[in-house]
């Protein structure tokens, strides 16, 4: 319908609306592509070049495609027949040379492929070894960290146990020291108490020793000690002596009624001597020499201090003191009476 040389009105309209800069390179590239395609088709199908393609304003029919397919099938069959004929016509020597040439090329290619494969495999092996080394190092680090953590935990536990044991030992030592201190304090306190008691007893004994002594019925000195032990020891002796002296007292009263007043001291003194002193030499000498008896001193202060007690005893025993100048005091075994005017001693026993 239209011209194919590019001078149609439609091409002119397209050229008007296109930019002049892009027009030239597009045309050049399109022409080059067309030339290349045509050359390839000519080589494959071995046919002369076709005319250049132009813009057409009609649909392409399917008949040319079918024609091209038929041409391709026929060309392949022709090529196969020609190859068979050439093989038949070729000599065996030429075939062997071609085979060896082909084998040498194949061998070179095979060796090159093997070398490439070995290099690639070696590279892969080296990378795998490096990865394994990294994994092993990582495992070693993790195991070392775990071992160090466990050892640190065990050491902390051991330290805690040691601290607890040390605290327990200190507590036990403190308890033992406290018990020892308490025992020592108790011993010291008991010793101090005993010392104070001994001092008090010693002071009391010194005071009693410093007190004025007095004569009992036997002519011996005795102090005014009043200890619980002495009282416990002396009390049964008092009872026995009281029983003895009751008899002597009655006999003494009989003798006193029969004998004159002047010899009363000697008779009373003779009867007042106990039995265990009757056979000694001192008692015999005392009977022979009555003037050797130590002179008794009147302790006015002691008697004055004991006057209330004497009055109570007199009231209890119904003793009547007719003579105001006579004094008496309680001895260890009875009541001792002293008369100032007559200078006589009277030893009277009584029982509480």
Swiss-Prot record:
Sequence segments annotated as region (Disordered): 200-227
Annotated Gene Ontology cellular components are: nuclear envelope; plasma membrane
Family assignment? Belongs to the IQD family.
What's one Pfam family here? DUF4005
List UniProt keywords, sorted A-Z.
Calmodulin-binding, Cell membrane, Membrane, Nucleus, Repeat
Where in or outside the cell it occurs: the entry states: Cell membrane; Nucleus envelope
- Report the domain of life of the source organism: Eukaryota
GO MF terms held by the record: calmodulin binding
Q: Where is the IQ domain?
A: 109-137, 138-160
List, as start-end ranges, the regions of compositional bias called Basic and acidic residues. 200-212
User: Would the keyword Signal turn up in this protein's UniProt record?
Assistant: no
Question: Main localisation, per the record?
Answer: membrane
Q: Where is this region: Calmodulin-binding?
A: 140-164
Record's function text: May be involved in cooperative interactions with calmodulins or calmodulin-like proteins. Recruits calmodulin proteins to microtubules, thus being a potential scaffold in cellular signaling and trafficking. May associate with nucleic acids and regulate gene expression at the transcriptional or post-transcriptional level.
What is the protein's quaternary organization? Answer: Binds to multiple calmodulin (CaM) in the presence of Ca(2+) and CaM-like proteins.
Q: What is this protein called?
A: Protein IQ-DOMAIN 15
């Amino acid at each position: 319908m239209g011209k194919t040389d590019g001078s149609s009105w439609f091409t002119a309209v397209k050229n008007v609306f296109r930019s002049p800069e892009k027009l030239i390179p597009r045309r050049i590239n399109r022409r080059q592509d067309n030339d290349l395609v045509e050359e390839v088709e000519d080589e494959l199908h071995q046919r002369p070049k076709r005319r250049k393609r132009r813009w057409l304003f009609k649909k392409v029919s399917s008949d040319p495609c079918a024609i091209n397919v038929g041409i391709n099938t026929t060309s392949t069959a022709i090529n196969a027949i020609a190859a068979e004929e050439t093989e038949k016509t070729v000599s065996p020597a030429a075939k062997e040379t071609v085979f060896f040439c082909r084998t040498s090329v194949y061998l070179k290619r095979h060796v090159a492929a093997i070398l490439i494969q070995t290099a690639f495999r070696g590279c892969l092996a080296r990378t795998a070894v490096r990865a394994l080394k990294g994994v092993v190092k990582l495992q070693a680090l993790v195991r070392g960290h775990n071992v160090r953590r466990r050892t640190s935990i065990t050491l902390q536990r051991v330290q805690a146990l040691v601290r607890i044991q040390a605290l327990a030992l200190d507590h036990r030592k403190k308890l033992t020291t406290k018990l020892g201190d308490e025992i020592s304090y108790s011993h010291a306190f008991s010793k101090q108490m005993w010392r104070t008691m001994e001092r008090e007893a010693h002071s009391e004994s010194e005071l009693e020793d410093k007190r004025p002594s007095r004569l009992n019925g036997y002519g011996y000195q005795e102090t005014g000690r009043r200890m619980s032990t002495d009282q416990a020891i002396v009390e049964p002796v008092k009872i026995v002596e009281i029983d003895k002296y009751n008899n002597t007292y009655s006999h003494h009263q009989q003798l006193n009624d029969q004998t004159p007043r002047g010899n009363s001291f000697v008779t009373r003194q003779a009867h007042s001597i106990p039995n265990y002193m009757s056979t000694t030499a001192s008692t015999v000498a005392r009977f022979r020499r009555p003037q050797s008896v130590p002179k008794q001193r009147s302790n006015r202060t002691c008697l004055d201090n004991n006057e209330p007690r004497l009055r109570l005893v007199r009231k209890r025993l119904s003793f009547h003191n007719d003579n105001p100048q006579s004094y008496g005091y309680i001895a260890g075994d009875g009541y001792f009476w002293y008369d100032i005017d007559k200078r006589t001693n009277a030893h009277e026993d009584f029982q509480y």
